């Protein structure tokens, strides 16, 4: 389960390391991948990196990886959903609320008798994810906390918020 940011947009990045990791993971188990802010940015913004990212995307699909763009795949009593949030939710130094109805409008409806796993890159919105119905959420973005203090947790978030809860 990969909640995004397998790649960054730099001239020097060939995405080869990410592809090697993904290839190895596919040998172990099915892989489910939702985009983080780096993939979303590379996908929608026209830039010198976009063509390289599209090639990466094609290779990911060739590997058989399940890329979930605001989609759900269900397996009996288990469902895995991938969420992409607006890039505006990643502004540095600003706490941007997620629009109240965003999850209901964006994600497929889930059923109460299904254990709902959510791949959602930004942990800032953990409460909103739980309110939507996520039973278990995998996040990324904080890269383990930019600075972590034992017994306290993260010191600062990527949005430059002090002592983030998630």
How should each PLM-predicted stretch be described?
Residues 1-66:
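Membrane-embedded segments
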Residues 4-5, 30, 36, 82, ...:
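Glycine-centered flexibility sites
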Residues 5-13, 118-122, 145-146:
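Short charge-dense sequence patches
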Residues 11, 43, 89, 147, ...:
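Residue-level recognition of conserved structural "scaffold" positions that shape functional pockets
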Residues 16-17, 48, 76, 152, ...:
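Generic secondary-structure boundary signal with a strong preference for alpha-helix termini
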Residues 23, 122-166:
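Conserved beta-sheet core of the metallophosphoesterase superfamily
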Residues 32-33, 38, 115, 129, ...:
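Aromatic side chains
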Residues 39-138, 142-143:
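Conserved catalytic scaffold of divalent metal-dependent phosphoesterases
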